[in-house]
């Protein structure tokens, strides 16, 4: 079995919104990488022993006092270094070059760089040829400051009309700097540049692949758990489902899954989870029907944040009760993924703001005295999905749109009642069914229905009715940080509306949400 961690890249984060994207691109190339805060110690870098280091972008200005700098050891470690945007600027400043503050001369968005000197980073890459016969590349810029003088030993590899040093290189030391962002899709050949860096310049082997990751995870789980038993909260979501499949492969019947039906799931979801994991895959599952307990706990509560906390608290209570019944369980498995780890590590800066509290199993009681098993903690979401496919989970389940941890608890506005949840389940199922039929489901990033606790007059036959309102929501996004409302065809929306009003007794009006993010969030609560 190949060692999937033998060749690796270290990415130092200076605060750019694109930093995780760099890590995902390196992983897609087939090379393992980790993302650390910029102020790591020499000992930590030596301990990690990377084959190459990437200095990512950031919002600060290199010209400002006390702005972040790469550890000096980065440039003495004897490995290739790639500086991206802010990373190029701090590399330049730290190695003797000069960076000046941009005053109205920044570049934001599309730009075209002209390659002036050959470099391993840009080998055999071009989007067009200039009139002077030099390669041109379409790139994505996002910088105000710029490098005025490059350090000794470097050459200017590329420039734009307003940026004299859009890329620089010291081929002897294998140090490279690019002022643009190769990790974003707008830089058309960006992935090839990162491939050149990781595979050719750093000489990493591309052995970070789903089959290898599964083999490695199963082997490590067997070593960690031995003959002990494990308990897992299975929600039917992507992360917990993949954890369940990995553990089942590693330890078989020594895994007990606890599936809590909180009454806030999608239509028939509880049955689907039990059929798939219990009947089809043969996992040992305890099914807890706790609908009344959750609804009773939320009675009279309309505040979204309070509802989230109640749902999380009741789940923890139930899980604690069930875990005590598994007297031989020594380990608790969780679906923690790499962005969760990065978020936790990065929170020490104090710069992150809580927009919504996250529903996680992290609040389990300390007295559970169980060891923690987190087989996905090195993986991004797209990697988790690929592994799920390899483990035999169905595509439709793995690539379903995101569903919030509190479920319909935050899609019923205000107080949550069984009547509201039942109506919402039916309406949402019609919307999703029609999206699939029209082959629109995978063309939007997320689609769902929201229950509004307001009544509206409607006409059915010769009579009037005074029933509830639902809102359809569909968005298109790349990263869920920003989103556009999806321009679904009017005839499609009309069909969905007619079906919901005619087929569901209790709903008299359907509206469509045309709010972008920002200013609105994707979920209503």
From Swiss-Prot:
The active site is at residues 85, 181, 183. One of its GO terms (molecular function) is ATP binding. It comes from Shewanella sediminis (strain HAW-EB3). Residues 8-207 form the Glutamine amidotransferase type-1 domain. This is GMP synthase [glutamine-hydrolyzing]. It catalyses: XMP + L-glutamine + ATP + H2O = GMP + L-glutamate + AMP + diphosphate + 2 H(+). Its EC number is 6.3.5.2. Pathway: Purine metabolism; GMP biosynthesis; GMP from XMP (L-Gln route): step 1/1. Residues 208-400 form the GMPS ATP-PPase domain. PANTHER family: GMP SYNTHASE [GLUTAMINE-HYDROLYZING], GMP SYNTHASE-RELATED. ATP binds at residues 235-241. Catalyzes the synthesis of GMP from XMP. Keywords: ATP-binding, Glutamine amidotransferase, GMP biosynthesis, Ligase, Nucleotide-binding, Purine biosynthesis.
